């Protein structure tokens, strides 16, 4: 079983974001990507990795008003992971591989093929993009374009990420654009793609100027990128993707006017 650790924070307590790649225990006809709701812990990181090896996984596909969902039940004989959620729902369309097919209301036992633990800051220092306080009458959108380089294939690529909506008066537009091309360059110091909910972009913030004034200095922004692990392996994302820089776009909002 492959196990990976992505460290974006080195203190305690910390938030653990765990993603499991699963295969059906008895026939290997079904594979799933499952992400455990984030939980906060002060356990040594290596202990969390060791304890996850012994977790057993049962998944059941169910029908809900929100569409097909996977009910995940985790169990462990060790009490060390007391803060880890043991039962939760995830979107079946994202979790199931294209070739996988689960019957409804039939519990299925799974083996762990690989897993990844991403270490993030405490929960009060984490922001997901949808949770950032909305702006009244937004006129513009702040987009972060994070550049990455694959050290094996030597290919470079950009990932654009919506950060937040802004209200900017026309007479102040020039000064805001100048800030985005200068000051904000120092606000985002590092970015990394981590396997969670498919893939998640983790951005570290060190400044609260301008567009980032609603965020705490030292916080982390999490932006979900979607279920791309069918095309990209855990090993490739963690070992070979290197963040090379971030640029910013101020886009006129479609709701402005």
Curated annotation (Swiss-Prot):
Domain of life of the native organism: Viruses
Motif stretch (Nuclear export signal): 193-205
InterPro entries listed in its UniProt record: Matrix_Pneumo_C, MATRX_N_pneumovirus, Pneu_matrix_N
Any GO BP: virion assembly
Gene Ontology MF, one: structural constituent of virion
TM spans (from-to): none
GO CC terms in record: host cell cytoplasm; host cell nucleus; host cell plasma membrane; membrane; viral envelope
Cysteines paired by S-S bonds: none
Summary of subunit composition and partner proteins: Forms dimers. Forms higher-order oligomers. Interacts with glycoprotein G (via N-terminus). Interacts with protein M2-1; this interaction directs the matrix protein localization to cytoplasmic inclusions comprising viral proteins L, N, P, and M2-1 and mediates the matrix protein association with the nucleocapsid.
Function: Plays a crucial role in virus assembly into filaments and budding. Early in infection, localizes in the nucleus where it may inhibit host cell transcription. Later in infection, traffics to the cytoplasm to associate with inclusion bodies, the site of viral transcription and replication. During virus assembly and budding, acts as a bridge between the nucleocapsid and the lipid bilayer.
Protein name as it appears in the record: Matrix protein
Native source species: Murine pneumonia virus (strain 15) (MPV)
């Amino acid at each position: 079983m492959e196990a990976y650790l992505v460290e974006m924070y080195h203190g305690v307590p910390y938030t653990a974001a765990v993603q499991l790649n699963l295969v059906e225990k008895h026939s290997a006809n079904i594979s799933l990507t499952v992400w455990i709701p984030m939980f906060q812990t002060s356990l040594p990181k290596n202990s969390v990795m060791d304890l996850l090896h012994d977790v057993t996984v049962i998944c059941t596909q169910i029908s809900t008003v929100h569409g097909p969902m996977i009910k995940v039940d985790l169990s462990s004989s060790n009490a060390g992971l007391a803060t880890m959620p043991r039962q939760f729902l995830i979107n079946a369309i994202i979790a199931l591989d294209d070739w996988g097919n689960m019957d409804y209301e039939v519990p299925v036992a799974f083996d762990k093929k690989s897993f990844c633990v991403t270490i993030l800051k405490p929960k009060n220092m984490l922001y997901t993009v949808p949770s950032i306080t909305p702006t009244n009458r937004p006129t513009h959108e702040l987009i972060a374009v994070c550049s990455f380089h694959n050290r094996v294939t030597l290919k470079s690529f950009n990932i654009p990420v919506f950060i937040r909506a802004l209200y900017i008066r026309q007479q102040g537009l020039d000064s805001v654009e100048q800030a985005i091309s200068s000051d904000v360059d120092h606000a985002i110091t590092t970015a990394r793609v981590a396997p969670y909910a498919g893939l998640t972009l983790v951005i570290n913030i060190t400044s609260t100027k301008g567009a980032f004034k609603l965020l705490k200095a030292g916080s982390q922004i999490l932006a979900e990128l979607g279920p791309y692990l069918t095309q990209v392996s855990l090993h490739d994302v963690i070992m070979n993707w290197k963040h090379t820089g971030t640029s910013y776009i101020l886009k006129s909002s479609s709701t402005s006017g």
